[in-house]
């Protein structure tokens, strides 16, 4: 196992793929900025040897795309979710080419929204190369909710969306609370919630 010892913990080692020699995420960003096509953009993403991120693409012709990036070890004997023995039975089998990670080009609904929620297609079969935890889906769901309203959105609409604070969980909680039979003083607090602008 090529890794470094963790000070003070005895025989414990850690390894981060993004610290491999030759990783050049900033150079990858430069390549992305100079890309003239979706194919060039995806090729540039292949140099993004960093922890997982979402990269999005748009061009002047109206094409849009999303590419999952980040260096991901190929683990054929374990998921990477928990620590394993350093006895040589859990070695990485290289790295998954970033270009093999999930991507979308010109989706049917004509938009794609990522707010650090899980956007990986359920059909993708290399989950240990993507991750196991994401942000709550509510912000992403709210962005999708707004974008689904139509294709005539303006720059002002986009500015408003950036500072949109509507809370989907609060709507769900109020709907649930409305079905409860409450006694005082809880009825009073529920009334307050009903007039909250989420």
Where are these regions (language model features)?
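Long, compositionally biased non-active-site segments enriched in small/hydrophobic residues and glycine
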Residues: 59-198
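Basic side chains
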Residues: 2, 15, 139-142
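Intrinsically disordered, low-complexity boundary segments flanking structured domains
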Residues: 2, 43-44, 53, 96-103
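Short, compositionally biased low-complexity segments
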Residues: 11-20, 112-119
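Gly/Pro-rich turn-and-neighbor structural signature
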Residues: 15-80
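Single conserved hydrophobic/aromatic residue that forms the stacking wall/gate
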Residues: 1-13
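A short linear-motif detector with a strong N-terminal bias
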Residues: 5, 33-36, 44-46, 89-94, ...
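Conserved short-loop catalytic and cofactor-binding motifs
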Residues: 1, 29, 131
């Amino acid at each position: 196992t090529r890794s470094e010892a963790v000070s003070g913990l005895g025989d414990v080692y850690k390894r981060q793929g993004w610290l491999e020699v030759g990783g050049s995420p900033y150079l990858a960003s430069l390549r992305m900025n100079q890309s003239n096509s979706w194919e060039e953009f995806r090729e540039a993403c292949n140099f993004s040897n960093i922890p997982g991120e979402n990269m999005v693409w748009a061009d002047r012709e109206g094409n849009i795309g999303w590419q999952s990036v980040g260096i991901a070890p190929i683990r054929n004997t374990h998921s990477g979710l928990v620590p394993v023995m350093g006895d040589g039975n859990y070695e990485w089998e290289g790295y998954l080419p970033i270009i093999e990670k999930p991507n979308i080009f010109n989706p049917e609904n004509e938009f794609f929204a990522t707010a650090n929620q899980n956007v990986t297609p359920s059909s993708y079969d290399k989950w240990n190369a993507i991750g196991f935890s994401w942000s709550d889906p509510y912000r992403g769901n709210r962005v999708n909710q707004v974008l689904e309203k139509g294709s005539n959105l303006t720059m002002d609409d986009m500015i408003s969306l950036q500072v949109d604070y509507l809370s989907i969980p609060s709507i769900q909680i109020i709907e649930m609370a409305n079905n409860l039979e409450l006694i005082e003083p809880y009825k009073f607090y529920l009334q307050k919630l009903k007039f909250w602008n989420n």
